[in-house]
């Protein structure tokens, strides 16, 4: 009995009560399970001192000693039935009876990651205090936010076809649902991926329409100057102002704009902290290195430290954004509908807003 384990032989025995198991056996076992006993002394005979441990109080409830620690657990219950359906119903009835008998604190609901995330559900979680909810953290199932004014520029990136443009469009729809007074400006490509926002947004232009782009920046800068003046004149702190959101479908195409217009965008991206401004810039993952190292607007975008990646692995972005993932997470390919949110020198895997409708 005592030498069996060294030869791969193990014994499992049962007894009706503590006196039904001889001492010679209990003295040579490495583990024991005790179901309901009459009092604490009977538990002690089998598994040692129980002290303040919660004792078994119903059928199937037991104590087990693991690494000198007593654990109270519920064994799997046999459920009668001729088929799976009958056994399922019997198990459900048993679970309901256990729930009715429970007198302790109610268990917390286990959060479950939804299959898809609607624009409206994220709009309901967003607000001037929290910021814009762009998705749900896959571990905590809590909303992940980017706050305009604290973050003034953020990249939305990934390979061709991952849904960058769709993501920008969904965020544009959402911020208007959060506050219809949001000032939403869109700079689009010739593919007109953001055209659906043209009617409800404040201003819309294609990047090839230089005069219209100039007018968009003029409107934004005018609003910023107005806010600065109001704050200067206000006797008390201005608590709330509508967000200023600028969506750029492909910021790399801004290279074709005149230098003075690019300089205006540079000012909007870097000199507007605290004024509710956020510039969301779509850019292909393959263009990041050259854009971030050779272009002033790229330097501005990278220096914000925030990005939402919609494809590839965390490793693909480590040259630009830090993360604290384990090795397996770093090398894991993003599934469709998920992203990595980079911010505050870390990365979080998220389920993206309405991301099942991926576009370009």
Q: PLM features: residue spans?
A:
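Basic- and hydrophobic-enriched, low-structure N-terminal and domain-boundary segments
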Residues: 78-80, 91-141
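P-loop NTPase catalytic phosphate-binding loop
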Residues: 1-41, 45, 53-54, 117-315, ...
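Conserved P-loop NTPase
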Residues: 38-107, 314-360
């Amino acid at each position: 009995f005592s030498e069996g384990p060294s030869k791969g032989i193990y014994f499992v025995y049962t007894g009706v009560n503590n006196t039904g198991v001889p001492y010679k056996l209990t003295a040579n076992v490495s583990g024991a399970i005790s179901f309901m006993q009459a009092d604490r002394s009977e538990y002690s005979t089998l598994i040692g001192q129980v002290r303040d441990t919660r004792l078994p109080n119903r059928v199937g409830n037991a104590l087990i000693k693991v690494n000198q620690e007593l654990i109270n657990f519920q064994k799997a219950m046999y459920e009668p039935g001729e088929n799976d359906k009958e056994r399922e119903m019997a198990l459900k009835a048993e679970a309901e009876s256990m729930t009715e008998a429970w007198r302790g604190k109610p268990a917390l609901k286990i959060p479950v990651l939804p299959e898809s995330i609607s624009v409206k559900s994220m709009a309901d979680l967003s607000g001037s205090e929290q910021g814009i909810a762009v998705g749900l953290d896959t571990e905590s199932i809590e909303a992940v936010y980017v706050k305009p004014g604290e973050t003034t520029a953020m990249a939305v990136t990934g390979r061709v076809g991952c849904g960058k443009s769709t993501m920008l469009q969904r965020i544009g729809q959402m911020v208007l649902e959060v506050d219809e007074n949001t000032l939403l400006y869109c700079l689009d490509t010739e593919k007109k991926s953001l055209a659906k926002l043209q009617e409800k947004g404040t201003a819309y232009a294609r990047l090839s329409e230089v005069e219209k782009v100039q007018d968009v920046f003029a409107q934004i800068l005018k609003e910023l100057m107005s806010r600065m003046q109001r704050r200067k004149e206000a006797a008390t702190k201005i608590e709330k102002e509508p967000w200023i959101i600028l969506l750029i479908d492909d910021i790399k195409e801004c290279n074709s704009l005149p230098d003075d217009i690019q300089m205006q965008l540079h000012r909007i991206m870097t000199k507007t902290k605290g004024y509710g401004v956020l510039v969301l810039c779509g850019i292909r993952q393959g263009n990041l290195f050259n854009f971030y190292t050779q272009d002033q607007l790229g330097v501005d975008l990278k220096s914000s430290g925030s990005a939402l990646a919609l494809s590839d692995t965390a490793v693909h972005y480590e040259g630009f954004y830090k993360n604290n993932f384990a090795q397996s997470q770093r090398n894991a390919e993003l599934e469709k509908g998920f992203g990595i949110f980079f911010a505050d020198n870390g990365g979080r895997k998220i389920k993206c807003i309405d991301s099942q409708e991926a576009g370009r």
